Design a protein with these regions (language model features):
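Core of compact, soluble alpha-helical bundle domains
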Residues: 1-36
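Immediate flanking context of iron-sulfur cluster ligation sites
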Residues: 47-67
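Iron-sulfur (Fe-S) cluster-binding segments and ferredoxin-like electron-carrier domains
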Residues: 72-92
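Long, highly charged low-complexity segments enriched in Glu/Asp and Lys/Arg with interspersed Ser/Thr
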Residues: 89-116
Length: 146
């Protein structure tokens, strides 16, 4: 999988990464198990090959990155044959693969430095001194130039 250019290009977007941080790994993996049970476990899943959205949840992106998104990918990349209901060991294998990928993304995000803080410039107002924010009456508004 790591040699596949298609699979390597997947990364968590900012919304999915925030969701993972907010909900936590345990909750997201519980979602993964639910998705696997409903969308992949049946012998003939509904809309097989199209049942996993491309974005919107960290698990969806992880499924595409780990080739656990449909039964044909499971067969080709994970060696799990089509045509039978997934057993407990196969389901656990899929969720574990998703978890490893999510953990690698979480660690990748921690290793990167946050971008520098953006400075916000005050708009130029003719006749006002932007450096002097103390007004004559003791307020905090800009004072007109004399």
């Amino acid at each position: 999988l790591e040699r596949s250019p298609f699979r390597r290009r997947f990364r968590l977007g900012s919304q999915e990464a925030a969701y993972l941080r907010e909900k936590g790994m345990a909750a997201v993996l519980a979602h993964a198990r639910n998705f696997v049970d409903r969308r992949l476990a049946p012998a003939q899943p509904e809309k097989d090959g199209k049942q996993t959205p491309w974005r919107g949840h960290p698990v969806f992106i992880a499924q595409h990155a780990t080739a656990t998104c449909c039964r044909s990918c499971l067969e080709k990349w994970q060696g799990i044959a089509r045509g039978h209901d997934l057993d407990e060991a196969e389901r656990q294998h899929i969720v574990a693969a998703i978890g490893r990928w999510l953990e690698s993304q979480r660690n990748r995000g921690l290793a990167r430095r946050p971008p520098p803080a953006r400075t916000v410039r005050e708009p130029f107002l003719p006749g006002l001194c932007p450096a002097d924010t103390q007004s004559d009456d003791g307020g905090t508004g800009p004072r007109p130039l004399a």
